[in-house]
């Protein structure tokens, strides 16, 4: 891969391996849990100073702000004393960069400062963007509570497939991707007086593109103010990007920086002496040891994804039921795919005599602040998407976090009192981590971004003003894919109607192509269900003590044509059984995920109606499965693979080897199919796989592949350059 997130590599730990781990007490005041053999060594974070004596830490057991009413809590936030300065800077500068640690109050208070100062007068709105939907929902809910108003009126939010706002909304939270889409209809974002780009340091692809567009907009709209909010010290990068003053006279600067002190306490950081063989099990053991031996205070555990979070939560709940002479252990999951009501549980006050354990992905690293956290367990891993330079395939990879992310995680333990962070990796490994995470725009598939830019009127995407330019090979791969999909023509202009319609879907281009072509294959009803199901992470759940039962049930849903037909089967049965939560539980199906897919499906149906795509079903037809699978090929022909005698699948383009994902329904087949397409890649495995016939590639993508034997292809190349954008060297 072209993307290397760390300096050096950690040995990949096994999940589900290794014995239970205990802790040995170090010879220092800020001790780790007390049973061994897993040994922790203490290191204090550089910005925290030395931890105070343990007797001082014992004086505070609960959140000192919990007894205050909401307005008193607002006043106590660190950012409140900067209120006047922030409002002055909004008058003085066109762009304001606010640097403040997570938890200082910038995300919830700055919008209220602006509202109170009249920036939402005359029908204008204040909009705040976030990279993640969970942050959008939680922040909007909190601000509405602080303003004592109904969520959706004065304060509202908009995320993909869910709009909780009305025409009178004054403060609106939304994902950065949705604000990008608004520019399609309103290029100058004229209804907004102030646009606040929050969590800009996360450098999502949408955020980077949005910053580039806003830089153009403020040159036209003198009345618009841009606020860029960041939790890390990269303020100069943003200031230089937005600064329009070229005279050298600072009095004419158009961008200014304000730093906000955080409300942090010292955090004692403990590293393991050696690498752990199974970080999920080690995280479970560490939680139990903290709960048995440490003072009151909630725990935050960082894992990489929904499957790990649910697995660890289940183990903790089982162990918690057997604990004696301990306070109650309340286990709460937190990840992006959770419904809003479930996500909000992480923010609920912890009852007396209870310790809350929040098991989260990296959404809890910076986007949201969970109250009451005193202990952090950092596994040192995160899942990121990265594109392979040669074959253009985007992979969801588990990689080590950066040093900046590790410090962010540790800092979550020091919000209300001196805290502790337990890192499940040695300090020597930490020193090999990269300083920061590579911006998403420099490691991901660019087709969606290019499609959006084209729709926004940016014709020369290479010369767009990027905060960090993407690599040229990524731009070329993205343009080639869009051309192959029929979204752009030979001059790189959007095609009509296909390219224009694809740009309006809040989906990756390959997904939207399948939807827009589905009526031609007589399966639009089925395809809208499959595409909706592709937007959720996991269709099935596998409790760690019921794996055999889950596999037996799962096998009943599996069909030999592959995962997408299996998804269709599951959703159909879900609807036939009244969308029952009990039915899902009995069949090890992800109820939360299917409810989300149901909502997404409704939104996609409305879009198809707007584009006058005929509603037609293949159900009951002899060639039903074939129609659906051929329709999938129209979008995912570039991700075709052939079975190799080594047991791997080789991509047709560039002959790149992949394993079959162990959770695929293909694994239930006696023999592996010879040809497949895949719509997702995790690490080195293809998942969400559908069986195809090789002739379909010839029929549906003759413009993308060359066909013939090795000798025929060699002779064709000797005669002249290939007229296609990609060539396959495999025999066909």
UniProtKB/Swiss-Prot annotation:
**Ranges where the Helicase C-terminal domain occurs:** 283-457
Task: Please name the InterPro entries in this protein's record.
Answer: DEAD-box_helicase_OB_fold, DEAD/DEAH_box_helicase_dom, DNA/RNA_helicase_DEAH_CS, HA2_WH, Helicase-assoc_dom, Helicase_ATP-bd, Helicase_C-like, P-loop_NTPase
What are this entry's molecular-function GO terms? ATP binding; ATP hydrolysis activity; helicase activity; RNA binding; RNA helicase activity
Domain named Helicase ATP-binding is located at 87-251
Group of enzyme by EC? hydrolase
Q: What's a GO cellular component annotated to this UniProt protein? A: catalytic step 2 spliceosome
Stretch list, region Disordered: 1-50
Catalytic activity as recorded in UniProt: ATP + H2O = ADP + phosphate + H(+)
Q: Which residues does UniProt call coiled coil?
A: none
Positions binding ATP in this chain are 100-107
Segments carrying motif DEAH box? 198-201
Q: Name the SMART domains for this protein.
A: DEXDc, HA2, HELICc
Assigned EC number: 3.6.4.13
Q: Which UniProt keywords apply?
A: ATP-binding, Helicase, Hydrolase, Nucleotide-binding
**Family of the protein in this entry:** Belongs to the DEAD box helicase family. DEAH subfamily.
- Give the protein's recorded name: Probable ATP-dependent RNA helicase DHX35 homolog
State the organism's lineage. Answer: Eukaryota, Metazoa, Ecdysozoa, Nematoda, Chromadorea
């Amino acid at each position: 891969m072209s993307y290397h997130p760390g300096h050096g590599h950690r040995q990949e730990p096994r999940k589900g391996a290794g014995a239970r781990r205990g802790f040995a007490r170090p010879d220092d005041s800020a001790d780790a849990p007390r049973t061994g053999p897993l040994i922790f060594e203490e290191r204090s974070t550089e910005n925290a100073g030395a931890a105070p004596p343990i007797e001082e830490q014992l004086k505070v057991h609960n959140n000192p702000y919990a007894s205050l009413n909401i307005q008193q809590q607002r006043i106590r936030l660190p950012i409140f004393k900067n209120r006047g300065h922030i409002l002055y800077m909004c008058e003085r500068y066109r762009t304001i960069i606010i640097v403040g640690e997570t938890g200082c109050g910038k995300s919830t208070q700055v919008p209220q400062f602006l509202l109170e100062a009249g920036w939402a007068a005359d029908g204008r709105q204040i909009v705040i963007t976030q990279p993640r939907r969970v942050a959008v929902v939680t922040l909007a809910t909190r601000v509405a509570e602080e303003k004592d108003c109904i969520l959706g009126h004065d304060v509202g939010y908009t995320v993909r497939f869910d709009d909780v706002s009305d025409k009178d909304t004054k403060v609106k939270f939304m994902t950065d991707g949705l604000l990008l889409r608004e520019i399609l209809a309103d290029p100058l974002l004229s209804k907004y007086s102030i646009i606040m780009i929050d969590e800009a340091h996360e450098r999502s692809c949408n955020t980077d593109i949005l910053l580039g567009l806003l830089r153009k907009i403020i040159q036209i709209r003198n009345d618009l103010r841009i606020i860029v909010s960041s939790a890390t010290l990269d303020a100069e990068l943003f200031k230089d990007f937005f600064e329009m003053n070229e005279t050298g006279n600072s009095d004419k600067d158009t961008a200014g920086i304000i730093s906000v002190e955080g409300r942090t306490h010292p955090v004692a950081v403990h590293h393991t002496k050696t690498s752990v063989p199974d970080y999920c099990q080690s995280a479970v053991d560490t939680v139990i040891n903290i709960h048995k031996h440490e003072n009151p205070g909630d725990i935050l555990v960082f894992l990489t994804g929904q499957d790990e979070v649910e697995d660890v939560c289940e183990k903790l709940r089982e162990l918690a039921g057997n604990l004696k002479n301990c306070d109650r252990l309340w286990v709460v999951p937190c990840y992006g795919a959770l419904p809003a009501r479930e996500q909000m549980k992480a923010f609920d006050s912890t009852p007396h005599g209870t310790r809350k354990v929040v098991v989260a992905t990296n959404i809890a690293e910076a986007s949201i602040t969970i109250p009451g956290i005193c202990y952090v367990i950092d596994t040192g891993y995160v899942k990121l998407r990265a594109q392979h330079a040669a074959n253009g395939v985007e992979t969801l990879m588990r990689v080590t976090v950066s040093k900046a992310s590790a410090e962010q995680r540790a800092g979550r333990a020091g919000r209300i009192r001196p805290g502790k962070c337990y890192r499940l990796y040695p300090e020597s490994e930490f020193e090999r981590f990269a300083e920061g995470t590579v911006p998403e725009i420099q490691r991901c598939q660019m087709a969606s971004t290019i499609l959006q830019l084209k729709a926004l009127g940016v014709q020369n995407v290479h010369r767009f003003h990027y905060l960090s330019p993407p690599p040229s090979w990524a731009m070329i791969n993205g343009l080639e894919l869009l051309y192959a999909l029929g979204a752009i023509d030979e001059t790189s202009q959007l095609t009509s109607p296909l390219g224009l319609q694809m740009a309006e879907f809040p989906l990756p281009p390959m997904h939207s192509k399948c939807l827009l072509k589905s009526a031609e294959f007589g399966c639009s009803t089925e395809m809208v269900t499959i595409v909706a199901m592709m937007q959720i992470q996991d269709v099935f759940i596998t409790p760690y003590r019921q794996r055999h039962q889950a596999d037996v049930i799962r096998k009943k849903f599996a069909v030999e044509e592959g995962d997408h037909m299996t998804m269709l089967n599951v959703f159909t049965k879900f609807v036939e059984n009244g969308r029952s939560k009990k039915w899902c539980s009995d069949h090890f199906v992800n109820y939360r995920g299917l409810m989300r897919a149901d909502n997404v499906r409704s939104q996609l149906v409305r879009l198809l109606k707007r584009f006058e795509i005929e509603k037609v079903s293949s159900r009951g037809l002899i060639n039903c499965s074939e129609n659906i699978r051929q329709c999938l090929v129209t979008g995912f022909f570039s991700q075709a693979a052939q079975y190799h005698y080594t047991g791997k699948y080789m991509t047709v383009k560039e002959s790149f080897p992949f394993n079959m994902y162990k959770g695929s329904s293909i694994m239930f087949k006696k023999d592996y199919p010879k040809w497949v397409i895949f719509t997702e890649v995790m690490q080195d495995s293809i998942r969400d796989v559908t069986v195809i016939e090789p002739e379909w590639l010839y029929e549906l993508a003759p413009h993308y592949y060359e066909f013939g034997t090795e000798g025929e292809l060699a002779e064709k190349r000797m005669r002249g350059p290939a007229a296609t954008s990609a060539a396959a060297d495999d025999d066909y």
